Curated annotation (Swiss-Prot):
Recorded metabolic or biological pathway in which this protein acts: Cofactor biosynthesis; adenosylcobalamin biosynthesis
Gene transcribed to yield this protein: cbiM
An annotated Gene Ontology molecular function: cobalt ion transmembrane transporter activity
Lineage top rank: taxon: Bacteria
Any single Gene Ontology cellular-component annotation: ATP-binding cassette (ABC) transporter complex
Annotated transmembrane regions: 40-60, 72-92, 104-124, 136-156, 167-187, 210-230
Organism, scientific name: Ruminiclostridium cellulolyticum (strain ATCC 35319 / DSM 5812 / JCM 6584 / H10) (Clostridium cellulolyticum)
One Pfam family per UniProt: CbiM
Record has Transport as a keyword: yes
Signal peptide: 1-29
Compartment(s) where it occurs, according to its Swiss-Prot or TrEMBL record: Cell membrane
Name the record gives this protein: Cobalt transport protein CbiM
Length: 248
């Protein structure tokens, strides 16, 4: 059987990215959209993101200095996340449901590195695809590029410690990271738009319940897809993954 290199998968992902630009999704399908949050919330979420982005920058720099091949893997993780997070399914007003794609990168490179990649992805989507917005970038980064990868990384490490097989550990990491992204998105929306009675919890329950109908199936599908890609990388880039402590 002909050996398939990691570069071929990267090329396929880049082609998919180009296809998104050629056949863009409807602009009504997006992350928390431009102008949907009050300025105070936009500033607050943005400030909360800054420490993670700074730490993530140095984390990426260190990993690339260790091996230049990590740059190819990181680019692939970024392309994978870009493609998946651009696949929109309409959900509650002002937002949407979609895979996040950041779980793979979190497992391979850690959560802080993926926070930088996720922020870049969200910025490009806001500017070029009208997905999300500039003012709401901080809120979207916090939920998808910070909390999601943190949860995925934590679940992967715990699963590894408890003796779970690599495939199961990756699936659980991606699944829970995906769901937690939307829990945080629901928190952001509930804080900005509490129930008419003034209850945060009532509003949060409404947002989470609506997101759940679309996000749970998407999280399962993303988990299965990520396991397939992880297995391919583990087969053809085992040395690099071992160096990243992402294989066992």
């Amino acid at each position: 059987m002909k050996r398939v290199s990691v570069k071929n998968y990267l090329v396929c992902l880049l082609i998919a990215v180009c296809a998104i630009f050629v056949f863009p999704a409807n602009a009504s399908a997006m992350h928390i959209m431009e102008g949907y949050l009050a300025p105070g919330w936009c500033i607050s979420w943005g400030v909360m993101c800054m420490p993670f982005l700074v730490i993530g920058f140095f984390s990426i720099k260190k990993k690339i200095e260790v091996s230049s091949k990590n740059l190819t893997l990181l680019a692939m993780c970024g392309a994978f996340a870009f493609v998946l997070s651009a696949l929109k399914m309409p959900s509650v007003t002002g937002s949407c449901s979609h895979p996040t794609g950041v779980g793979l990168g979190a497992v391979l490179f850690g959560p802080t590195a993926m926070s930088v990649i996720g922020a870049i992805i969200l910025l490009f989507q806001a500017i070029l695809l009208a997905h999300g917005g500039i003012t709401t970038l901080g809120a979207n980064v916090f939920s998808m590029a910070i909390v999601g990868p943190l949860v995925s990384f934590g679940v992967f490490k715990l699963s590894k410690r408890w003796g779970a097989k690599a495939g199961l550990a990756v699936f659980l990491a991606v699944f829970f990271g995906d769901l937690m992204t939307y829990v945080i998105t629901s928190v952001e929306l509930a804080m900005a738009y509490p129930d008419a009675t003034g209850s945060f919890m009532v509003s949060l329950g409404k947002f989470i319940s609506i997101f759940g109908f679309t996000q749970v199936p998407l999280a399962v599908c993303e988990g299965l897809l990520t396991v397939v890609i992880y297995n391919v990388l583990a087969k053809y880039s085992a040395k690099e993954l071992k160096a990243l402590s992402a294989i066992y």
